[in-house]
């Protein structure tokens, strides 16, 4: 099917053609016609499936028709809620891309950016706003935004918004909008919590489910390396990044502190490397991502929160320096590579301290991650991957598609620094309900927008 068959207007089709796209993705093919028909919908789809365009294009088409509102409100006709600033920026860029040949007044309301700029945006007529819940609530409490003419509410990555503690904020924002609005909800998982949210906010929604697990995993070669300790991880990393085939890579660290230290170490060794985490100002994060896209950065050391929604083409490798505590985050991490028909390589380090996380991941994806050994860097001890000594049973797929996220193992354990024996505080961890995410929530509320300088690196331990 071509985009022209989706009944999109000519200005949008012209923008799509300019981007070089010819065929809609499955989520676009299913969601766009229903959205254009004005139906509420729930779409279960993973990142990298084209879901952003699936709601941006119908939103723009709605804005091509004059508003029927008779009031004098300057508020938006379309509101897109998303959990992180990175996702908000990505959606804002999509609006500009597909609305290139339309006269659309749009803007972003998110933490880490000056209040006065957002106040100026809200004081003028605006058609479409992309926002993070925390900062939007701040403006609502100040009486600076009116939703009386809102026609469309989009919840992007709704499951992640709830995970980050935005459930009450989402309900409050939705309650401030007209009950006659159209609502579209996009989520990676569909559990009971999400079902209850949909029941509260949506009206007789159409359900769309796009399979994503097998497609994602089949495009990515997964590898596992057993690590004796942090020094062993460093030596293996040094070997792996010397591969000329590693054009562009994201290295995931479990803490903000270690992301800074690791990036500094890599930079000192002559690599074009930088860190990306929640303590950085929005401008610093945008600058880092732009440098990555332009090829100025080869190795990006990131935490889960900062990399959520990161859309950079040409990522050949993902390296899990630290395994995520949550199995779902593993899939989101490795999904940064192997996109848009390309293949990718995902390499994970696992020490004896991370066995529980590894077991959870392998149960979630329904397979064992093939183990490899680097000659000369063999582990001193084998990794006991399963309590029974057998491979994990194949997954039925239900956990991926609908059940709640996997249990967090070792939640109260303080991870060790990769550059010494000193333990880091749990407040530095980047787990699913970590304080890093909670701080990101507060930053979106505008209370903690400062930028902390990267800590100096510890003496090198790579030899």
Predicted regions and their residues:
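Conserved helicase RecA-like core
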Residues: 2-383
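Arginine-glycine-biased low-complexity disordered regions
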Residues: 246, 268, 294, 312-314, ...
